């Protein structure tokens, strides 16, 4: 604890194995085939499709239900993947209307009446969570738990937050400039 984290400043080519191959990041997303882009100052390439990319949508759904976000018991990564593939959930809102597919869920391998009932109860119990957890659950880039708390304190209500986020997207607005 308290140690200095070293910064990578270059490659020591003399230490590289002779048979090593230069890594080339993919120019196209392996999920949706959209062009990838590496923003200046960032270490990773990103798919430019956003929520249109199935892989990004699935990962956002996983984050949304994760322990530090909505913390929905019984709705783990594998189940999210299966429900997305079957078209049962496509976005955050679908999670809260999944009860409409109760009969369909009960027929799935590994899911029975009791586990589906427990899942629906768990989802129902999370209809109200703290504002900071909601902000964190949205998976906004560079908004972790600490920034989510700060945003919740700043805006107090979801409506205030929503209004400011709409302003921030408006190129004619003075917000966040």
Q: Where do the protein language model's features map onto the residues?
A:
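Flexible glycine-rich surface loops and low-complexity tracts that mediate binding to linear polymers
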Residues: 1-7
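Accessory alpha-helical DNA-binding modules that contact the DNA backbone or grooves
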Residues: 3, 12-177
């Amino acid at each position: 604890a308290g140690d200095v984290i070293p910064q990578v400043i270059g490659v020591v080519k003399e230490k590289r194995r002779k048979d090593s191959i230069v890594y080339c990041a993919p120019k196209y997303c392996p999920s949706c085939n959209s062009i990838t882009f590496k923003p200046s100052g960032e270490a990773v390439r990103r798919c430019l499709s956003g929520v249109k990319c199935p892989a990004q949508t699935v990962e956002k759904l996983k984050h949304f239900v994760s322990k530090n976000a909505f913390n929905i018991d019984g709705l783990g990564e594998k189940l999210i993947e299966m429900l997305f593939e079957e078209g049962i959930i496509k976005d955050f809102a679908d999670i809260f209307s999944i009860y409409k597919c109760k009969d369909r869920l009960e027929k799935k391998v590994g899911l029975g009446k009791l586990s589906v009932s427990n899942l629906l109860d768990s989802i129902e119990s999370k209809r109200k969570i703290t504002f900071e957890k909601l902000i964190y659950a949205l998976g906004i880039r560079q908004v972790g738990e600490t920034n989510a708390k700060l945003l919740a304190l700043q805006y107090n209500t979801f409506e205030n937050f929503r209004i400011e986020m709409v302003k921030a997207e408006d190129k004619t607005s003075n917000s966040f400039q």
